Amino acid sequence: DFVSIGTNDLTQYTMAADRLLGDLAHLNNPWQPAVLKMIKLTVKGAKRASVNAGEKKYVSVCGEAAADPALAVVLVGLGVDTLSMNAGAIPAVAAVLKSVTLEQARHIANKALEQISSAEAKAAARAELPILDELGL
């Protein structure tokens, strides 16, 4: 058993903003702290279900968020087990993930969660990931 989080839909419904409405497009950003908190709560629920069931419930994230190298670090730091993305995104995501420990990913995730806006959350995470600039990301 596993839990799969579709970040595109999660973001749309968490922010109550239709992706097709231009005036609300700025809200459809998976870096929104509210969306990150929903992911964290989902992971926590899956861990609780794992204890109750006596077997691990894996949490997977699919959608554009998993393909963002900086956000992938945050997702892993939040406890996400697997990331589903298009093949073209794998090299950059893998390079960035290999550059941090799990403890560092958790620290970066917490920094993002502390922010008020999506822009601040993204900036806080990127500030902790100098490899992004080194790789031109």
Regions found by a protein language model. Give the residues of each.
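Non-catalytic helical/linker scaffolds that mediate oligomerization, partner binding
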Residues: 1-137
